[in-house]
């Protein structure tokens, strides 16, 4: 698998495209290791300058943020046909329109969710084996909300088990499995009562500081076999935590 595939989060050009937050080809490759890894993203392109100079970068250690109750947060997620894309940097599940998160009475449509191994956010410096990012956008303002769920090793996750047989090895070739439907709600913890909320950035180039982060206070589980299957396909794809004011 070509982990140096030419990809970029072209957020600005997609704002009015109706495609949601997608990955597009770029003039410069980036990766998670070596000379085009996270320590060098800001050097790869002027478009990536925020990766080096931004003051509100993500991810962070959650010990720097006070958890707040989830009173202002509601989920209206509906089942969607399973559509998977291997971007070369993660596996993305594209979501059909009609599902949303409501934050302080404002609706944010769920565009997609994707995975990181290990987790990008930490607690007391400790990673979990995986993290799931649910990317939402408010249509009138184009504001982004990313809901994050940490994944610890434990019992097999039945929702992941529906998806994992179809993890694609070909890059940028969307695959829809019409006989399998998934509901993002099934990947959220049943017991979460608090959330870590802060203003931050995309965790991949161009590292735009346009994101409200909501990291749920309780994790979900996945089996070691499920975690290993994702790792064998993608490898490590987590940006280190960032030093920044909160």
Q: Model-predicted segments: where are they?
A:
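Alpha-carbonic anhydrase
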Residues: 2-246
């Amino acid at each position: 698998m070509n982990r140096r595939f030419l990809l970029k989060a072209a957020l600005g050009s997609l704002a009015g495209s109706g495609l949601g937050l997608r990955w597009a080809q770029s003039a410069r490759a980036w990766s998670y290791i070596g000379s085009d890894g996270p320590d060098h993203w800001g050097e790869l392109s002027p478009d990536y300058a925020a990766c080096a100079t931004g003051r509100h970068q993500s991810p962070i250690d959650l010990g720097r943020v006070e958890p707040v109750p989830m009173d202002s947060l509601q989920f209206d997620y509906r089942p969607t046909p399973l559509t998977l894309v291997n971007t070369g940097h993660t596996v993305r599940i594209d979501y059909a329109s009609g599902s949303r998160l409501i934050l302080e009475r404002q609706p944010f449509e769920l565009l997609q969710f994707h995975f990181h191994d290990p987790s990008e956010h930490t607690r007391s410096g400790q990673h979990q084996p995986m993290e799931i990012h649910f990317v939402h956008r408010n249509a009138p303002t184009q504001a982004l909300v990313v809901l994050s769920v940490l994944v610890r090793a434990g019992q097999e996750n039945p929702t992941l088990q529906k998806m994992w047989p179809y993890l694609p090895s070909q890059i940028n070739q969307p695959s829809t499995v019409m006989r399998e439907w998934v509901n993002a709600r099934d990947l959220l913890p049943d017991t979460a009562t608090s959330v870590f909320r802060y203003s931050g950035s995309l965790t991949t180039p161009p590292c735009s500081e346009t994101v409200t982060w909501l990291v749920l206070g309780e994790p979900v589980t996945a089996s070691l076999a499920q975690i290993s299957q994702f790792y064998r396909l993608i490898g490590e794809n987590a940006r280190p935590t960032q030093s920044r004011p909160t």
